[in-house]
Amino acid sequence: MASTDSKDGTAATRPRRGRGDKAAAIAHAACEVFGRDGYTRASIDTIAAEAGASTRTLYNHFPGGKAELFRSVMQWSAGQVRDEQLVRLRKFLDPQRPPRPEDLERDLLALARAWVALMTDFRDHFALVRHIHSEAGHVPTEVLDAWQEAGPRQVSRELTVIMAALADHGLLDVHGDPAQATAHFMVLISAEIAQQSYWGVIPLPAEETDRLTAVGVQTFLRAYGAARRPR
């Protein structure tokens, strides 16, 4: 279960350590160790020590060892971020109540800024994501797939439905491929910020984050704005 105290941008992505709940203590420690050391360098001995558990106890809870533990932590953490992404998506883009054409850029920008802020709000999770990107060749494929399915793919599917609805309302021209429009939107609003901030490890100045996000939305609308539709 998640802690609701995210004042420092980290607690919201950590499992809560319940009294006597050794599995939660191990997961909590694993989240910190994987976020700090990455998948390859993290060791079962270190995780067990930080959890105050023996390696035997750890394997009793996670028989698959490091791979199973990493998958469990990533699925849980990705689920937390996914839920918050969907809350923010539905807040700013409701396909049942589409924005007026003149308000579309405003609403897309509000969504983009809310999503980019997740890198700060969920620092622990994005520390894990940063390590996944740098160590993808060493992380088991099933772990990568479980992470994608727990979070990014679900968000992408819901945004794709909304992109299609906006196109149906004449607000966007997705050129018959709302999934591709979704992929482009997500990259344009966040990729440069993620790269420059190392996935939120070194946050950019607020004004630079706002500028890059605005440029991303404007670039998206130049490619997919309904005004580009042939008449």
Locate predicted features.
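N-terminal intrinsically disordered/low-complexity leader segments
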Residues: M1-D21, D83, L89-L93, R228-R231
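Helix-turn-helix
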Residues: A25, A29, V33-Q75
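Solvent-exposed, amphipathic alpha-helical segments
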Residues: A25, A29-D37, K91, A114, ...
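Short, basic, alpha-helical segments at the C-terminal edge of helix-turn-helix-like DNA-binding modules
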Residues: M74-V81, V87
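Amphipathic alpha-helical packing segments from all-alpha helical-bundle domains
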Residues: R82, R106, T120-H133, T141-H169
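Hydrophobic alpha-helical connector segments
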Residues: Q85-H125, P178-T182
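Hydrophobic/aromatic-rich alpha-helical bundle segments in the mid-to-C-terminal region
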Residues: D145-E149, R153, A164-G216, R228-R231
